[in-house]
């Protein structure tokens, strides 16, 4: 059985591309270290990657992709990771909060009707990610199974833009 998707794998690739200069995230007006990169990793998949960047180093990142609608509203799945050197400092929590505010600011005016969800599916055994999701999305997650791996997971959901 495969493992639950690990956002840290994508973070390593993002970090390498940032250092090599093959990607150029744009600065966000809301936070001096917050940058965003919009890309299409595969046909039909739009991805927004937010990162706290200093010089050519990403300290933490959060990736948003469109997921299945929830309660008739758009839903974005979020995954996040922090560079090993910066873990335990609250950066992932700060980044998820800052990136959700930026996403809400840019997306809300474009929606046909108000409101969209952000969802994190977190492995039941991932204590660090559960803390971040509890602090940023919901204090009352729903027990579920990860669709890809079948492993026990928790679903954290937050409604934005209303």
Model-predicted segments: where are they?
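Residues on conserved beta-strands of the protein kinase catalytic domain
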Residues: 74-76, 152
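C-terminal "cap" of GNAT-fold acetyltransferases
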Residues: 145-162
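Conserved active-site alpha-helix within GNAT-family acetyltransferase domains
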Residues: 117-142
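Conserved GNAT acetyl-CoA-binding A-motif
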Residues: 105-121
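Acetyl-CoA-dependent GNAT
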Residues: 14-73
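A short beta-loop-alpha structural element at the N-terminal edge
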Residues: 1-20
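Conserved acetyl-CoA-binding loop-helix of GNAT-fold acetyltransferases
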Residues: 88-105, 131, 135
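A short, internal acetyl-CoA/4′-phosphopantetheine-binding micro-motif in the GNAT/acyltransferase core
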Residues: 79-91
């Amino acid at each position: 059985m495969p493992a639950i998707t690990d956002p840290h794998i994508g973070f390593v690739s993002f970090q390498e591309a940032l250092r090599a200069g093959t990607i150029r995230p744009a600065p966000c007006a809301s936070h001096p270290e917050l940058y965003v990169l919009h890309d299409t990793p595969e046909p039909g998949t739009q991805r927004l990657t937010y990162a706290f960047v200093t010089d050519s180093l990403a300290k933490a990142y959060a990736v948003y992709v469109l997921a299945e609608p929830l309660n008739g509203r758009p839903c974005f799945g979020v995954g996040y990771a922090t560079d090993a050197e910066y873990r335990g400092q609250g950066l992932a929590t700060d980044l998820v909060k800052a990136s959700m505010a930026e996403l809400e600011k840019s997306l809300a005016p474009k929606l046909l009707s108000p409101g969209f969800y952000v969802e994190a599916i977190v492995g039941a055994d991932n204590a660090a990610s559960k803390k971040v999701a509890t602090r940023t999305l919901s204090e009352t997650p729903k027990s579920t199974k990860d669709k890809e791996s079948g492993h026990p997971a928790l679903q954290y959901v937050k409604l934005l833009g209303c």
